[in-house]
Amino acid sequence: MTKNTHLEHPEDVILSGDLTVLNWFNSTDVWTNCNLSVKIDGSPAIVWGTNPSSGNYFVGTKSVFNKKLIKINESHEDIDKNHTGNVAAILHKCFDYLPQTDGIFQGDFIGFGGDDCYQPNTITYYFPEKVRHSIIIAPHTVYTAEDDLRNAIAHPMGDIYFTNNTLIDNDVLWFQPHATIENDTEDIKNRCKFARQIATLCQFPDVKQVARIKKQLNSCIRNDIELDDITLEALASDNKCDINVLRLWKLVASIKTDLLLLINTDHDVECYIEEERCGHEGYVLSNEFGTFKVVNRLGFSKANFNLSKMR
């Protein structure tokens, strides 16, 4: 359970010296009682449910969680007041078709029905046949909030279930591929032990340094700059930080890659980036030690950045 915050890559957390991520990799819950979901590349994010402060049904974007400029839509008139263009058109349909539940949910919008090919963001999804439903939503998060959406607590969602008839009529296609992890963890456990040894040699940077290092690492990934030891030494020198911290970051990133290879997805929807077949954007995995996104940054993040520049 976490506040409604941005999900981190596991390797980025290690930069501050937080070694609980190694417990996250190493926990038996990763393979047994974890909550694993496929990360879908939809847009925009849609939040809907019952507003705890009014008791009314609402839809919105992530702006429903804003501390100041809050945009909660409890009617079509609210949507017209708070939003314009394509986002408003999407929210009008979501207001009509999403289930009016007592809870609070979030999912990514994939598209309107009537086609078999959708590109809401970077990845293009090819469905096996034309979608007959009115809207397509990829649900991923359920929230609890006692009195105000600004205090909402996020919980990862398992298989979706609603009590009304939206699962059997043509209102909503819930796009939620099922993912499993192979129980072959010995190599990951050994590499986590090695990472702990490396951590004993590290002088970890402060919060401001970590933020700057993360931006520079993202820039390298997006611009296809190889993160070899020469690049890491340059980053360490520029940020006046211990080179061993960046070597540890790279090691943890490679452990995450090993984890990715153990995850399988069972779904008949094909994924492409431009003309090249690809896997899903990644996964979100939760256990007793935290919730992290497991994404192939060298593949997806670079493509996402480059396609965003072209639009």
Please give the residue ranges for each predicted region.
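Core nucleotide-handling region used for phosphoryl-transfer chemistry
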Residues: 1-34, 39-44, 48-311
